[in-house]
């Protein structure tokens, strides 16, 4: 008689990271419950069709969290940065940690961002040039996870997601890609560390399957560090389209239609940037038969979602 499948509540399941985690856990025979405001959305319906159970709930609503967590032994936690100034990321993160602890959850896997925790060492940190609250919110929620007293916890810290080059995200992140251009304020020499959302799912699954190994770890996630020229060359080669990178001033980037907060983040990448120890990561994951996806392989897999008319 097989053991009862452990139940994991996945937040953000209709987004890139949560969706990847939900799919990986379903494929590993976990019982997956997704927390969603709209179970009728195509993303939620696809997961339901794959075997997930959907509960209607909201990180704003503590009573909905208690119901969603009933019987759950694990939680996958992801929050959206608070752009509206309502402290939403911390409120949601803290509420989920508290509700999970109260519900008897034993393994809490949380996704944050690479370099959170090193933020006070960034050049120009004190001037608030880098949207300090983005970094301090991420760190505060991480600290809440580590300090809550879960039997097992794991914090995943991804670098820049490859999904930003595919639809629907590319429309906002790389608005010129459709015309065969990647226009950014990244310097030609700046390398951006990349990770596929699917791989965040793979690592989260590994953490739930083998808490003994992954518990108590803060894990940076990146596989490659590429310049935008290298990104453009890879896209050109795989898609058989002309894609070229243009490095412009921050002012020019904003003028061309790249949103200001993202341009500021590009400046941060020039001056600080994600600094995951990729060789060490590859080695430690390799020992557990986890192979992260290089950018070229990711482009091949997602070619249909990368829209270039050029």
Summary of predicted features, one role per range:
Residues 2-45, 60-63, 67-70, 74, ...:
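Oxidoreductase cofactor-interface core, primarily capturing Rossmann-like NAD(P)-dependent enzymes
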Residues 24, 214, 238-239, 250-310:
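A hydrophobic C-terminal alpha-helical subdomain
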Residues 47-61:
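Rossmann-fold cofactor-recognition segment
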Residues 51-54, 83, 192, 306-309:
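Acidic/glycine-enriched edge-of-secondary-structure segments
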Residues 56, 157-158, 247-249:
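Short loop/edge segments at beta-strand edges and connector loops
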Residues 85-91, 271, 277:
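Glycine/threonine-rich flexible loop motifs
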Residues 93, 138, 170, 265-268, ...:
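A general structural signal for well-ordered alpha-helical segments in protein cores
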